[in-house]
């Protein structure tokens, strides 16, 4: 907790260990294999992997065509970025980023190491996500706050500014695209 507080409140720099990168690459290989359709079920069809090539919740049995998988993931982030209210304090948002980076670095989520590297770069640069203080989805309670972080990290060049999340850079509150360009 002491180091978490130092990162969140004092800007202690953080980095990713080579062993964490190796673990993430191992699980990423499995996710990429699943997303490519090369994992097969008993009938020889691409294996359904919840949330990777299927819908979510009541749409879990709906198979998503491979050409729509990126759209599925982006729309999930957009749909869950539904928080409202004043932003949480910056140190709370920074702690959230570090805790999520730490969880992803364990290698059980199938994410790219570049995602964790980018999260740590946010922390090290002082570019802090604006995370609304109210609203969430699901029993975990962290989906909406993390979706606001996701908007900041996963927008495309053609996205309107108001769909790129928001971040603090210095004392300025900016759209995500502008904050990340600094």
PLM regions and their residue ranges:
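Conserved, well-structured ligand/cofactor-binding cores
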Residues: 1-182
